[in-house]
């Protein structure tokens, strides 16, 4: 043990990992620039989330601090951080955020070839009770040669170049999915870098946990009601599934990825088109799941096949372990045929 160094002198950071992947693909390095800038925003948000109580960032947009500056709510602050960092990466041309009604077109002198759709602080409505929150992102290549516009963001999830999320939990983790698979990076606060901790992550074929908001049970489709009953009272007398629901999509999906099982936010009578947003919630998570060997469906088609018509379009989503999602689809198709 005496000859063991206290530090790993050859750590694989996210920057190094993306540079290596870019080199294999003979890329221009633009995606590396983009992800580096995104990482900086994530580190800043992570710091802000941890300091929120002390810095009075909880739900007080409009108040002023001791120097007379406007104090921003965490989600507004997070949005500004991601926007500014992505613009300054010189790799983006169109930015779509949950916080902005219209797409943001990057100034000509800062433009690059990528379109980024993101939710800067998913689950922020839960932050007052210290529930884990996160940042979700999806990166597309601009397809047209025209001037950048909102239309450039209206691409199906199949066109994603990279997607993922940052989870601000007991530690800060960044999960990145690209063609090479899904990789997890943990923020080491000692050196301020994301370190590769889980390589080529694969989800279990079948899990033991289901996750959805059962408070909406009254409005569920019969197919969803039947599927949940099967999880609670399995027809073959096997052990029932455990129920876990945080209400923060990043936390619920990350647990599903790590432990296996199924996450559902289906359409219901109140929200016939689903509630989660396709471009910056459903698509990135569906991409992560598929790259990890899982599945993601709306019930009618794969989430990644949905062609968006609006940047804030909603979609139902059922994702997770392939066997669990297939079982849901079997029940869903049975009810659709009736």
From Swiss-Prot:
Record note on quaternary structure: Homotetramer.
Keywords in alphabetical order: Acetylation, Allosteric enzyme, Carbohydrate metabolism, Disease variant, Gluconeogenesis, Hydrolase, Magnesium, Metal-binding, Phosphoprotein
PANTHER family: FRUCTOSE-1,6-BISPHOSPHATASE 1 (PTHR11556:SF11), FRUCTOSE-1,6-BISPHOSPHATASE-RELATED (PTHR11556)
Reported tissue expression: Expressed in pancreatic islets.
UniProt effect for mutating residue 119 to A: Reduced activity
Residues at which AMP binds: 18-22, 28-32, 113-114, 141
Organism, as annotated: Homo sapiens (Human)
UniProt-annotated binding residues for Mg(2+) 2: 98, 119, 121
InterPro entries hit by this protein: FBPase_C_dom, FBPase_class-1, FBPase_N, FBPtase, Fructose_bisphosphatase_AS
Associated pathology: Fructose-1,6-bisphosphatase deficiency: An autosomal recessive metabolic disorder characterized by impaired gluconeogenesis, and episodes of hypoglycemia and metabolic acidosis that can be lethal in newborn infants or young children.
Pathway, per record: Carbohydrate biosynthesis; gluconeogenesis
Protein purpose: Catalyzes the hydrolysis of fructose 1,6-bisphosphate to fructose 6-phosphate in the presence of divalent cations, acting as a rate-limiting enzyme in gluconeogenesis. Plays a role in regulating glucose sensing and insulin secretion of pancreatic beta-cells. Appears to modulate glycerol gluconeogenesis in liver. Important regulator of appetite and adiposity; increased expression of the protein in liver after nutrient excess increases circulating satiety hormones and reduces appetite-stimulating neuropeptides and thus seems to provide a feedback mechanism to limit weight gain.
Protein name: Fructose-1,6-bisphosphatase 1
Catalytic reactions of this protein: beta-D-fructose 1,6-bisphosphate + H2O = beta-D-fructose 6-phosphate + phosphate
């Amino acid at each position: 043990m005496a000859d063991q160094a206290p530090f790993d002198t050859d750590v694989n950071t996210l920057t190094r990992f993306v540079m290596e992947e870019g080199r294999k693909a003979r890329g221009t390095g633009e995606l590396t620039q983009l992800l580096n800038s995104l990482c900086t925003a994530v580190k800043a948000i992570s710091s802000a989330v941890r300091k929120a109580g002390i810095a009075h960032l909880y739900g007080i947009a409009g108040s002023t601090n001791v120097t007379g500056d406007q104090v921003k709510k965490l989600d507004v602050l997070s949005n500004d951080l991601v926007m500014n960092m992505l613009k300054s990466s010189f790799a983006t041309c169109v930015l779509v955020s949950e916080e902005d009604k219209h797409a943001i077109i990057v100034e000509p002198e800062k433009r690059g070839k990528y379109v980024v759709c993101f939710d800067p602080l998913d689950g922020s409505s839960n932050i007052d009770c210290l529930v884990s929150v996160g940042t979700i992102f999806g990166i597309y290549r601009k397809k047209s040669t025209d001037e950048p516009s909102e239309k450039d963001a209206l691409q199906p999830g199949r066109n994603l170049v990279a997607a993922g999320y940052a989870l601000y939990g007991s530690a800060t983790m960044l999960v990145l999915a690209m063609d090479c698979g899904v990789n997890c990076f943990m923020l080491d606060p000692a050196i301020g870098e994301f370190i590769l901790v889980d390589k080529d992550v694969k989800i279990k074929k079948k899990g033991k946990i289901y996750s959805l908001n059962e408070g909406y049970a009254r409005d569920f489709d019969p197919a969803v009601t039947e599927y949940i009953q099967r999880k609670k009272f399995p027809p073959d007398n096997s052990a029932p599934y455990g129920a876990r629901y945080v209400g923060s999509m990043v936390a619920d999906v990350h647990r599903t990825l790590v432990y296996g099982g199924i996450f559902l936010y289906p359409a219901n009578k109140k929200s016939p088109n689903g509630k989660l947003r396709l471009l910056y919630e459903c698509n990135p998570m569906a991409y992560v799941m598929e790259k990890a060997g899982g599945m993601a469906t709306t019930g009618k088609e794969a989430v990644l096949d949905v062609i968006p018509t609006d940047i804030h379009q909603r979609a139902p989503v059922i994702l997770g372990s392939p066997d669990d999602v297939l079982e849901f689809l079997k029940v869903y198709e049975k009810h659709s045929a009736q």
